[in-house]
Structures are given as C-alpha cells and as structure tokens.
C-alpha cells in the first residue's frame, strides 16, 4: 500500500519536500493555512506598486532547478530569472559608497576608493570562504548532516575543526583578513541571510560570501512569488494534493509516533509520516503540546533569529543613486548587533536593507515612481512587546536616516505605505515570536546549528524550513525539504530489506 505523507505548511521547505516525496512515489497531502503557496515568499500589490513581502534575493538557483530535473523538466519553462552582476550598493554614514559586483576583479574596477591591498585582501577572504563552502557542501548540504558530532564523524576531528573554522566567529574571521573598515562591515552583514549577528555566529557562515560570488545573485522576473507559483505548479503536476486555507490545529500522537492531524474543521487525516514546515518550537508548543520542561530546554538552545520592521513604500519620485539592492549601514555595527541580539531593543542607528526592484523591472511601479522596500533587523517579540508608539518612533528614525543619507524629502514623496511588524509576521506565518529567519546562529549557544530535521521525540515526524538545518534563506529551506525526503526514502529502503 502506498504510504501517505502529510506536509504541514506550504513554504518553500514544505512544497520542496512535498514535490520530492511525490516524485518518489508517495501519496502526499499538503495543508497551508494561507491562500497562497510559498510561505514568506508572498506578494503585495496596491496602487500600481508591487512588493515582495518576504525574501527579495534569489541565490543558488541550482537547488530549485534540481526539483524540476527530477521530473525531467526545466525550471526555465516555469519561471524566468535574471542574473544581477551588480549585486548591491553599500551606503555609509560618511558618504562613502561601495558597489559589490559578481567577481572581485569587477568590484575593484568599479570602486576607485578600494586600494590594491583592499582587493588582494578581498580575494584572500574569498579563497578562505571557498574552502569552507567546499567542505560544507560535501557533508552539510549533500548528506544533510545535522549536528557537530555528525560533522566530526564524517570529516574527521582535525579536518572538521580546521576547515569549518569553529575557533572563530564570523566577524573575527573577516577582521583577521580584511583591514578596510567599510569592507569589514559590508562582509559582516552577509549574516543578514540568517538573521543573526556576525559577532556571535561561527566563522563557517563566512561561506555565504562565496555562495553569492560563485552562484550569483538573481531576480525573479515579475516578483519572487513567481518562483513559488512555479513550484506549486510542479507539485500539482506530480500529484501532490494541496489544500490552501486549511489550518492544522493538532498533531495526534501515540507513544513515540505521530498518527495524523486534526484540521480546524474537525476532520482527522491519518499519516504514515508528517513533515512540518511550521517552525519546530511552535509545532511542539501549539500542535503537540509538549511539556514545559522540554520546551524550555529547546528554547534556551535554539533562540529565535531576528525579526524585522518592514516598510513597503510607493514613492512619487525617483532616486537615481539607488541600485536594485542597497544597504544603508550604521555608524557602529557592533552596537547595532548588541542592541538587536543582546539588549533586545529597537536599535538607535539600524543598518537598513533597501530593495528597489523597479531599477530592474519597470513593471513594479508606475512610470516616474519607485517601489521601495525597507528592512532593518529588530528583535523578535519579547515578553513585553514593543508598543505602537515604539514602532512609530522607530519609523521616524528610519526615515530620518534614509533622508540624511541621500534620499532627499523621502517623507514628502511617500504616496503609499504598508508596514509589517513582528506581530504581523507571527500572525501570518505562525513563526516563533515573529522571527523571520528561524533559529539564530550563535557559536556559544548552538555552534551555528539549527534544529535537526528528525524529531528527537517522535520517530516519524520531520521538520523543514528556517528553524532546521541547513538554515534560513530561500535555497537553504528548499534544500531542507529535499534532505528530509532523502532521509525518509533511505529509511523506507532500509525497512524493506
């Protein structure tokens, strides 16, 4: 008899797992509480402006392409992606700007401010991150390794210690090789992909720089939601039964097994395996009602990553100095990280990520206007949450900073505004305390590891998404779905022997 897989949540991890399980011959049912597939890969359109509500950067497209190739299909027949050789522009408080290009040579050619020594150091750092990326790919990505002990067993103790560089934090690894203060801050903020602090995260995450340099930075034409739509279409073609507007209220358990799910309609659906794309702690807390002692232990080790204050602005003017992707950096990177990740307060001078897709795709705003998405990282929801007044003051702080750093009269030109707070993120995606990136990467707390993909409490329960390895970001959560499918396939093959 064909075994039945239930997938809870249609984010990229969930839809990826569903596709691979269906491709492997299982009966698959996916339940998504929202009316769209893609999770945080969401879309907002109003007054002629289009915004990607969630991720705005596509990297490592080969991970997505593999899903189509398993079905002997081409992703290019489903969605169009465009490479962006000019990856982003960095603005600094003293007026300095640095343009990051795909390729160290190209970055040097486009930035007269960078010296020969700067470029040599940048190349040296890229070589260092390449070594980490290569060894990470062998075990962490290709075999879905989940713990430090698995890493050590796979690679050997000395090889793992040296090549994963578990001695240093990410920022220490950067500062050891880079002397230019602007480059130090820019490279440190690659940690944005996982919503953590470069001063706390292990140096292994330096590989994020090499990933982007080698694999490129891409734009999904028409908006990144088209990628989720493509995956949904592939899933349906492979026979996945997708239920949207369907909320799972409870996971039924018996001893050390999960037996099925109870929907908000009261219907019970049996399962041989359950794959949860809901974050690990909310799954245990709200769907399984795990005891407080075990929950508290998990919460101490796997703290949420950062959230964000997300502004979607329709602007009745154009700012020619903006690139597609932009970063407006803080005066004091260390203080910014401290306030967000340790003091848990709204930062005084946040680093701001600003996306202006209209620079590449003119269909995203009316002629002569621009669509601007603004995202500074802020703490996840605290026991005493920030108030409406707190957020209003923070909004003013953001706009003050952007105007001061060159976006003249931005306030006057805003004709449309939509804002998402951590509370909105938690409500819409059931994320843990409104975190955007799952679990924080912290060298001391968890060695940079997220939750394992296999439940430690229930033998046929698996997890995908940003709260499990290999981590947050679109390619990683998509890869987690493929890795879980591989684990279930391997287990079933072993059972048949």
From Swiss-Prot:
Enzyme Commission identifier(s): 1.14.99.-
InterPro entries: Amino_oxidase (IPR002937), Carotenoid/retinoid_OxRdtase (IPR014105), FAD/NAD-bd_sf (IPR036188)
Cofactor: FAD
Entry-linked SUPFAM superfamilies: FAD/NAD(P)-binding domain (SSF51905)
Catalysed reactions listed for this entry: all-trans-4,4'-diaponeurosporene + 2 AH2 + 2 O2 = 4,4'-diaponeurosporenal + 2 A + 3 H2O
Keywords linked to the UniProt accession: Carotenoid biosynthesis, FAD, Flavoprotein, Oxidoreductase, Virulence
Pathway: Carotenoid biosynthesis; staphyloxanthin biosynthesis; staphyloxanthin from farnesyl diphosphate: step 3/5
Enzyme class: oxidoreductase
Biological process according to GO: carotenoid biosynthetic process
GO terms, molecular function: oxidoreductase activity
Binding site for FAD: 7-19
Assigned protein family: Belongs to the carotenoid/retinoid oxidoreductase family. CrtP subfamily.
Its job: Involved in the biosynthesis of the yellow-orange carotenoid staphyloxanthin, which plays a role in the virulence via its protective function against oxidative stress. Catalyzes the oxidation of the terminal methyl side group of 4,4'-diaponeurosporene to form 4,4'-diaponeurosporen-4-al.
PANTHER family in alphabetical order: 4,4'-DIAPONEUROSPORENE OXYGENASE, PHYTOENE DESATURASE
Name of the protein: 4,4'-diaponeurosporene oxygenase
Organism of provenance: Staphylococcus aureus (strain N315)
Lineage: Bacteria, Bacillati, Bacillota, Bacilli, Bacillales
């Amino acid at each position: 008899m064909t075994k039945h897989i239930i997938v809870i949540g249609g984010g990229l991890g969930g839809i990826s797992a569903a596709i691979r399980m269906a491709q492997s011959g299982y009966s698959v049912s996916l339940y998504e509480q929202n009316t769209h597939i893609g999770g945080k890969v969401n879309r907002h359109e109003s007054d002629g402006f289009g915004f990607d509500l969630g991720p705005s950067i596509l990297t490592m497209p080969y991970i997505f392409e593999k899903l189509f190739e398993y079905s002997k299909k081409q992703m290019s027949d489903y969605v169009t992606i465009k490479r962006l050789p000019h990856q982003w522009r960095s603005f600094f408080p003293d007026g300095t700007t640095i343009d990051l290009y795909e390729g160290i040579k190209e970055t040097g050619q486009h930035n007269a401010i960078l010296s020969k020594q700067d470029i040599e150091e940048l190349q040296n750092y890229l070589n260092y991150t390449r070594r980490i990326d290569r060894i990470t790919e062998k075990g962490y990505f290709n075999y879905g390794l989940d713990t430090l002990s698995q890493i050590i067993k796979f690679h050997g103790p000395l090889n793992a210690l040296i090549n994963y560089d578990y001695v240093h934090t990410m920022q220490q690894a950067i500062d050891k090789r880079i002397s230019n203060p602007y480059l130090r801050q820019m490279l440190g903020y690659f940690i944005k992909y996982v919503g953590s602090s470069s001063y706390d995260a292990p140096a292994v995450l330096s590989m994020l720089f090499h990933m982007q340099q080698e694999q490129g930075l891409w734009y999904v034409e028409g908006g990144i939601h088209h990628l989720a739509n493509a995956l949904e279409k592939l899933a349906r073609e492979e026979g996945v039964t997708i239920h949207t507007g369907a909320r799972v209220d409870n996971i039924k358990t018996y001893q050390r097994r999960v037996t099925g799910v109870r929907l908000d309609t009261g219907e019970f659906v049996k399962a041989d395996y359950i794959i949860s794309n809901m974050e690990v702690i909310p799954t245990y807390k709200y769907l399984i009602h795990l005891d407080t002692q075990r929950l508290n232990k998990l919460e101490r080790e796997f703290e949420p990553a950062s959230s964000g204050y997300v502004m979607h602005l329709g602007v009745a003017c154009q700012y020619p100095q903006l690139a597609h992707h932009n970063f407006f950096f803080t005066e004091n990177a260390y203080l910014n990280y401290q306030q967000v990740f340790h003091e848990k307060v709204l930062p005084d001078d946040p680093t701001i990520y600003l996306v202006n897709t209209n620079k590449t795709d003119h269909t995203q705003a009316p002629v002569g206007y621009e669509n601007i998405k603004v995202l500074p990282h802020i703490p996840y929801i605290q026991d005493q949450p920030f108030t409406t007044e707190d957020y209003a003051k923070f909004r003013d702080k953001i706009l003050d900073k952007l105007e001061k750093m060159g976006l003249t009269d931005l306030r006057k030109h805003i004709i449309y505004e939509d804002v998402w707070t951590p509370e909105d993120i938690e409500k819409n995606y059931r994320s843990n305390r409104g975190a955007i990136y799952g679990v924080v990467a912290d060298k001391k707390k968890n060695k940079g590891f997220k939750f394992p993909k296999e439940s430690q409490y229930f033998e046929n329960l698996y997890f995908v998404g940003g709260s499990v390895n290999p981590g947050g970001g679109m390619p990683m959560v998509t890869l987690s779905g493929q890795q879980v499918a591989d684990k279930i396939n391997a287990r079933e093959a072993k059972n048949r022997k």
